[in-house]
Amino acid sequence: MPKPRTKRQAIRDERKKKRRETHEETHEENHDERQSKRRRVDGEDRDEDEDTQQQTYNDAGDHPQPFHGNGPEKEFFGMLADEEQEYFRRADELLELNQFPSPEERHVFLQNVYKEARGKELKLASSQSLSRLMERLILLSNTRQKKQIFNAFAGHFLSLVQHRFASHCCEKLFLESAPIVTQELGGIVPETEGNYDEMEVEEDAEPDNTMENLFLMTLDEFEEHMGFLLTDRFGSHTLRVLLVILSGRPLDDSSTKLLLKSKKKEYISVQGATGASDELTHQLRAVPESFTQATKKIIQDAVAGMDFTALRVLAKHPTGNPLLQLLLELDISLNHKSDKSSAAASKDTLLYRLLPDAPASLADETSQAADFVNSMVYDQIGSRLLETLITNCPGKVFKALSHNFFGDRIATYVRNDIASYPALRVLNRFSKDDLVEAVKKIIPVVPLLVSKARYNVLKTLFERCDARGAYEEKSALTRALTDALGPNPKDLVPKLCHLVEDESADKDQFQQSPQNKTAVAAHGCHLVSTMLKTPGNASKVAQKSLVALPPDLLVKLATTAMASTTVLTTALASPAAPQNEFFHKALVGALAPHAAELAQSQFGHNVINAIVEIPSRGTDRCVPFHVKQTIIASLAGHERALRDSWMGRSVWRTWKGDMWKTRRSDWVKWAKEVDGPAEETKLKPWERRKLEQQKGPQPRQPPRETAKEDKE
C-alpha cells in the first residue's frame, strides 16, 4: 500500500456514495419482504444471520473470540427472490453436470447466467447454497469479468471476508486474479473471449482498471482493521491468501497449499475453466514494487499497538498463530535478508519485537527474548511459531538461540512430544561440529526415543549426518538403534514398520487409537526408507533385515500402506551395500511368486513397476533377466484379472505385456535397454567383431605432429 493513493481513494469514496444512495432508496421497499424471507429460510441458511453465526461460533469452542473485541459491523446484503434462487440453483446443477448438447449452447447458457448475476454478486457470495455458483463463475470468467466482480465487491470486502461463505469467494477471486497482475506487469494484456463481449459492454461502464490497483484498493479497506483480521475466524484465512499473492510465492507449491488449505473447505471445480500457465502458478511470480511495500505495511499495521505481552498472547492464539507465522517469515525475508542495513538500524521489525535486543538479549535468562523462547518451546501452538523463527531467522540470531537454549538441552527437547519439533528445526541448521556434539548427547536416550516412537528424530539425525559427512556418528546411531530394538538386528524392519504385534507394547498402550498406530507405523517406515538411502552401516543393516523377512511379511509390507510400499521401492532403487551384492536378486526372488497378487493391489503395484527398471547386469544393483521373464509370464497368466483394475492395467502397460505376447524379441530388447552400455562390454569376441563390421571402416586420425605441419 504505497502512500500516494489519493486518486484511488477518491474513486472509492465516489462509489461508496452511489451505493449508499441506492441502498437508502430501496431499503424501505424491501424491508418487510427481507424480514419474512429471513424467517422462512432461517433453518436452511442460518449462517447468514449474524446472531446465529456468532452463537455457532461461540458454541464450537474451537475458535476463541476475536483478539481485538467485536470488530467492525457486518453488513447484510439481502436475499434473492424465490424465482431467482431456483434459477441459480438450477444453473449451478447444470454447470456441475456439464451435459450440454454442444459447446455453443453452453456458451449461450453461461452468457445468460452472467447477465442474470449482474448486480446480485453480493447476495450470491453470501448465500450458503449459491456461493458455490459464485466460485464457479469466478473460475469461468475472463480478465474483464474478474475485474467486474472486483468492482461489485468493492467497498464490502471487509464484511465479505468475515462471512463463512463469501470469504471463500473472495479467496477464489484473489487466487484466480493473481497471475493477471504478473501478465499486466510484463506488458501482456490477457485476451477476453468474444463469447462474452455482448454482455460485458455497458453504456455507463467505467474504464478498466489494472488488476494491481484493484488489489491495492482492496487492501485500503482492510488498513484500519488488520489487528482484528489477525484472529477473525474467516478473515485471517483470507488475509493469508492476500499475503501469499503480494509476496509472489508459487500458488500451487506444496508448502503454499499447506498454508492456505482449510480442513472443512469444499473443493469447487467446473468443466471448461481456463487456468493460468504453470509458470505463473508453480514458480515465483514477478510482482510490482507496490505489492512489496504493501506487504511491509500490512506487517506494521497488523501488530501496531501491541506490546510484548499482547504478542505472546497472539502467538498462542489458535487462529492468529498461523497468520503470525506467515507475517514473521515475510518480515525476515523483506527486512532482514533483502535490506539488512535498515533492519539493523530500525529494530522495529516483527522479529525484534518478538525477540527484543536480540541476539545479545538471548544470553540473559531474565530478558523478554529468553522468556519468549522458554514459554513457546513447550506450548502446543506457540512452538509452531518458534519453528518458523528457527528456520528463517538470520544466522547471528540462530547462533544465539542454539548456544543458549538448544545446544546443551537438545537431548531433553527431543524426548518431548512438543519441544521435539523446534529441536528438529535446530538440527537441520546445525553445522557439522554442532551436529556431532548433539548426536553424542542424543545417543544415550535412543532407547527412550524408540520406546516413545519418536522415529522422526532418528530420521532427521540420519539425514543430517549424511548431509554433513558425520560418518562415525551414523555408525554410532545405527548401533544404538539396533541395540534398542533387541538383540537380533534382523528385527529392525518388522518392529519399525509394525509388521508384527508387540504384546508388551499393546499392554502398555492399550488405549492407542487405530489412527495413531497407523501414524506411528508410517513414521517407522520413513525411518527405514531413510536408512536404505544412507550409505554405510545403516543401509547394510536395513537391507539384511529386509531380506530376512518371510514372504508373507514382505507381501504385507508391500500392500499395507503407501509408506510401507515406499520402503520396498526405495530398497529396489538404492545400490546394494558392501558384502551384500545379491540383495536385489534375493528381494525380487522373494516377491516374484506373488507378482500377480501385488499387481492388483492399490499399493503393491508400485513395487512390481519398480522391478522392471532394475538392470540385468550391474555392480550396484541387478536382477537376473530370467527373473523378469518369470514375472512377465506370471502376469500374462492373469491378464484378464489385471485388465479389470486400474492397478493391473498400470502394471501391464509398464511391463509392456502386449509387446511380450506379440513381439517377444522386441520385448527382450526393450527390457535390456536399462542395462545401458554395460551390455556392449559383455559381448563375445565374435559378436564384437560382427558389430564392428556393421559399423564399417573408420578413417584413421593423423598423428598430432603431422596435423600441425599440414596446417603450417
From Swiss-Prot:
Pumilio repeats lie at residues 116-151, 221-261, 368-403, 590-633. Keywords: Nucleus, Repeat, Ribosome biogenesis, rRNA processing. Residues 21-35, 673-693, 702-712 have a biased composition (Basic and acidic residues). Residues 1-75, 673-712 are annotated as: Disordered. RNA-binding nucleolar protein required for pre-rRNA processing. Involved in production of 18S rRNA and assembly of small ribosomal subunit. Belongs to the NOP9 family. This is Nucleolar protein 9.
